[in-house]
Every structure is written in C-alpha cells, then in structure tokens.
Amino acid sequence: MTTDQPKLEPIDPRTAQQLYLDHKRTECTESTVRNHKYHTNYLVEWCEENGVDNLNELTGRDLQEIRLWRKEVGDINLLTLNNHMSTLRVFLKWAGSIEAVPENLYDKVMVPRVAPEDEQADETLDGDRAQEILEYLSTFEYALVEHVLFGILWEAGLRIGAVRALDVDDVAFEEERLELVHRPDQGTTLKNGPGGERLVVVFR
C-alpha cells in the first residue's frame, strides 16, 4: 500500500531556521522575527547538543525531550514555556511544508495550557516581560481582543475600566491618540467621572 507522504529533503537545523526566519520577514514585523529567532534558537541548540544534524530525523519523542529540556535549562514559568512551544509548533508546521519534517510532526508538539491564575502575579510587570507578551500576542493572537487590550493597557498605562469605556470614535488614528470620555448614560464610566476625561497618546 502506497502513501502520499512527500519524500523528505535533508536539511540541517540552522539552515532550516534561517530559511524560516527569511520566510517570516515577508509577513511579520522585525520584532516578531526576533522573537521567533529567540525561540527557535533553543531547538537548534538542542539538535547540536544531541547530534541531530538533519531535521528529517526529528521524532515525537524528541519533541517531548525538547519540551522537558527547555523547562529545565531555563527554569522558566508555564507562560514562557507555552510561548516557546507554540513557536516551535509554528516552525515545524512550516518545516513540513518544505519537506524538512513529516507534515504532521507539528501536531505532536505538546503546548502546555495556561490557566488564568497562572497569568496573574502580584509583582510589577517589567518592560522585557511586557515586550515578550506583546510579541506573543502579535504572533498568535494578532488583532484579537486580548492583543488590543494588552497593547493599550501597556502603552497608555490605563485602567481596564478606562479601556472598556472607549468607543470606536474615541480612537484618532491620524492624531495617534485616544480620548477618554465619561458616559454614565451609556454604561461606560470613568473612575473619576468627568475629571478622568483626557487625551492619551498611545501609538508609536
């Protein structure tokens, strides 16, 4: 019985990574490309440490070992591991399209689920962490509610209630600003009432 699986073409991990990043540059911002490079560097490092010089050789068991290894060497939290494994899954799906790995190998990447409580913390969010979150959202949840909400919260330093009070007409794209308006009759209020109304520059 024959199958329709295409024949794999040998390619070393570092060359595959470079081709992948060149591909991402045609459709993503440079910051997103840097994020993908950072995440896939760990795959290349693991392959070099384990003598995998042909990406064709990767197996589902290897992917599990990579997941455990990444958690161990970086002592990273669940959200960061989720980001790394999600990028690996995207990379392997692309790799399958160029006959570098089996087409369905990306399905074997185990991406950990992140519960809402794991996304919350008491400490202040620093700039590097915020950038990592923004890059993840721009890659995997582009223009969805979570992406837009987090971007405005971080860039403008607003309360969630203030962001919820925004209407479409409050966004001035040409002036690159938001206008916060207290509208109690419409159910979109500001914490300080009319005293909280102001203009906020958010676009960079």
Residues of each region from the PLM?
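Conserved tyrosine-mediated DNA breakage-rejoining catalytic core shared by Y-recombinases
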Residues: A165-R204
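Short, flexible, mixed-charge acidic loops at enzyme active sites
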Residues: P10-I11, D107, E123, R177-Q186
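DNA breakage-rejoining catalytic core of tyrosine-based enzymes
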Residues: A115-E132, G187-F203
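N-terminal core-binding DNA-recognition domain of tyrosine recombinases/integrases
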Residues: T2, Q18-Q120
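Structural detector for helix-capping/boundary residues
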Residues: R61, D128, L166-D169
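Amphipathic alpha-helical recognition patches that constitute DNA-binding helices
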Residues: T32, T80-N83, V148, E197-V201
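Basic, Lys/Arg- and aromatic-enriched nucleic-acid-binding interface segment
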Residues: G127-I160, R164, P184, G195
